[in-house]
A protein has these predicted regions:
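Short alpha-helix
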Residues: 167-190
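A short acidic, Gly/Pro-enriched loop at the edge of an enzyme's catalytic core
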Residues: 99-111
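Conserved class I S-adenosyl-L-methionine
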Residues: 139-167
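Class I SAM-dependent methyltransferase SAM/SAH-binding core
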Residues: 33, 38-101
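A short glycine-rich, Lys/Arg-flanked "PGG" loop and its adjoining helix->strand segment in the class I
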Residues: 124-139
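Conserved catalytic loop of SAM-dependent methyltransferase domains
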Residues: 187-212, 220-222
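Class I SAM-dependent methyltransferase Rossmann-like catalytic core
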Residues: 1-41
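C-terminal lobe and adjacent flexible extensions of AdoMet/dcAdoMet transferase-like proteins
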Residues: 209-268
Length: 268
């Protein structure tokens, strides 16, 4: 993993500022639309998100869950709850480390990780914590920058290599998929987003055609990938009890009734 410049503070907080730039707003729109799709058929009571709350307000409004909890290493990301269509959801913010969630086991219906894995040292431990707090059939939705793209190449630029979002880890979709599988989290869907290169504002409007072309011709090279996985719990198969006893063969090849052996034969 590349090391982010410590003078910039928390890389996730720096990422939140980057989302306000022209390029960051392009990414935020694509990720917000994707999250809204992935949350469309996700139900439950408790939704947990680690950081970047401001970038996903539209998706949160459309979410069917009533309680939303935002976690983060700082409390700057927490915003007041906003009404959803005909209802309102509660919003709470708690300071926490991503690999030590202050939540009970099997207590959360869905978890959102917006680039959390990109900027944590122990990404696998974060997923392990997510698996712990999810209920059976609960879902995790995560976003990561794709190193197998022009965005990944930009991370090797000397001027950008220690600044968010370029200083994060090099997690490929395949590695993340392997980790999920090892933890019993079954990958349901994966989407590739943002096929235009990370160029300045003057060129962004001229590259809209790359989004359609990228989805069709080089889908694995999107600058961002999103994954939704579900926690599968295998049910134990009970052993079938042996209620009947094997009949004993008597002389003359007659079969002894089991009822007589159990004392239930009628007297005669």
């Amino acid at each position: 993993m590349k090391v982010c410049d410590p003078r910039d503070g928390d890389p996730l907080a720096t990422l939140a500022k980057w989302y306000t730039t022209p390029l960051g707003r392009q990414v935020a729109r694509a990720e917000n639309a994707c999250l809204e799709r992935l949350l469309g058929d996700t139900f439950g009571h408790y939704l947990v998100q680690f950081g970047a709350s401001g970038q996903f307000e539209d998706a949160a409004r459309a979410c069917r869950m009533r309680h939303r909890l935002v976690l983060g290493e700082t409390l700057n990301e927490c915003r007041p709850g906003m009404p959803t269509a005909g209802r309102s959801f509660s919003l709470a913010c708690i300071r926490s480390q991503p690999d030590r969630l202050p939540l009970a086991s099997a207590s959360v219906d869905a978890v959102i990780l917006p680039h959390t894995l990109d900027f944590c040292v122990q990404a696998h431990e974060v997923l392990r914590e997510v698996e712990r707090v999810l209920i059976p059939e609960g879902r995790v939705i995560l976003f990561c920058f794709n190193p197998l793209s022009t965005w990944g190449l930009m991370r090797w630029m000397p001027r950008r290599s220690r600044q968010a979002p370029w200083c994060g880890g090099q997690l490929t979709p395949f590695r993340v998929g392997d980790w999920l599988r090892l933890l019993g989290l079954q990958q349901e869907t994966r989407e590739m987003l943002v096929f235009r290169p990370p160029l300045q504002r003057a060129y962004l409007s001229q590259l809209d055609w790359l989004e359609t072309a990228g989805m069709r011709y080089w889908p694995m090279f999107g600058g961002v990938f999103a994954v939704r996985a579900v926690k599968r719990v295998q049910a134990l198969t009970p052993l079938r009890p042996s209620w009947t006893q094997r009949a004993r063969i008597l002389p003359g090849r007659a079969v002894e009734p089991t009822a007589r052996k159990n004392g239930h034969a009628s007297s005669g």
